[in-house]
């Protein structure tokens, strides 16, 4: 090994996000609400959302959610600034899996949250646009996929449930 991190909290398995959060020219490794420097040492640990659900590890992501030109970490029910401070949070929502996309044409993107078998669409400040909507067929749900599934020029939200894959329109309906 070139390096090995210390033990991270709340990690079962997961997929790290890689981004240069602090603009030092070196990428950081984002795992849930924890950020490692590129040498494996801990840069910061957030105090809230973790982007995980059930017995599944974190799948956080990096996006400029508030359009300030700086990367933000989206982790479950929380958006962190690049320095680890909380930018937006909705404690009434569970932790879960996220995706970020612009669904309504406004400058700020929206945040999809999949957790506990339900789907929410959130504004960039973590207020609820719609949801919760149960995933047909049951199951906890996995990481959402954003794509134009039906070729109408608008993004939809794809989510795997226990027994089927479901595509939600941007208003939360399923065709």
Predicted regions and their residues:
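Extracytoplasmic/lumenal domain signature
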Residues: 1-175
